[in-house]
Every structure is written in C-alpha cells, then in structure tokens.
Amino acid sequence: MESECLELNKRFITYNTHQRPYIILKWAQTANGFLDNEGKGMAVSSAFTKMLSHKLRAENDAILVGRVTDERDHSLLNVRDWYGKNPVRLVIDRHHPCFDGLDFSKGKAEVLHQIMSFLYINKVQSLIVEGGAITHQSFLDAGLWDEIRIETATSKFVKTGTEAPRLPHDVKPISHAEYDDNVIDIYERSRH
C-alpha cells in the first residue's frame, strides 16, 4: 500500500521534497538507437503511441525542448490526440529565454537549475523533457530526472543520425509495453 501511495503522489512529493518538478525524460528512437535520420526529424511513433504521448502531456504541467529540436520539428508540444489541458511549453534558447533573468553565462547545469527554480516558484509540479539529445544529456549529467520513457520503433533503422542518450547506471526498469512495432520502456532511479 505504501508503494502505491508513493506512486500516486510522486509529483507532489518530488515538488515538495526537492523543490523542483518531477522530471520525465522522454524520447523516441529507432531500433538501432538514433533519434533522427542524418539530422533530419522523422516520425518514430505510431498513431497509437503518439496518442499515448499526448495523454502523458495532458497529465503533466509543463513540457520542455531545446532550441535545435524546436527549430527542426516545429512541434506544438500540445494535447491534440487526447483530451485535457495543454502543458506549459518551454524552449531552452539563449537568444529567446523562456523567462526573464535566465542567465546562460554559467553553463548548462546552472541554466537547468535556474529553470527548475523558476518552475518551482510558479508551482509547476511535473515536467516532460522531450528533446533533443543535447538537452536530454544535460538533464542526465545534472542528475535532474526522476523517470525515463523510451519509445523504440523496433522495425525502423537508419544509417546515421543523432544517437539517443545513454541510460545512466542508476536506472531500474519499471515497465515494458509492446504496441505493434513499437516498444515503450519506462525506467526510474534505483533506490539503494
């Protein structure tokens, strides 16, 4: 019963304990571990897994991508294939900061901590990070993550592209689901 309560309240608990949102890193990759095809965006999700992605967006307060992903994909980052409230859309871009006072002069980790503080102050309890590779790796390197969701298109291969981030060593698989030719794996931090 205790584990069910913790799962149900994980966003609230993380927000109040760590003074930051609960962070979900989410990406879709090819069977051979690429996020794109030679730097060009491509559809990896099926219609069904795209709908699941929009459901996840509706369940969380904010969504974040890096500048390159935003410029390449022009994604609306909203809830189109599900119902519910759109998450707050954030883009990490030094030329167009997502809020006043964001200081890029101190490095990636500090920028992420500034964003987490901003989200905490604005009562954002949950954040999905949808890309790209540099942004995901920055969150991983800073230890700013609670859950990782990876969708793999098991029958899609590309010759070259942007490699998917590497999973950290302190992960524990918590879910594996197959949907036609796509698989969604969910990981959380190992509790020692």
Spans of model-derived segments:
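Enzymes that bind and transform nitrogen-containing heteroaromatic metabolites
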Residues: 7-192
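Active-site loop-to-helix "anion-binding N-cap" substructures in soluble metabolic enzymes
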Residues: 1-7
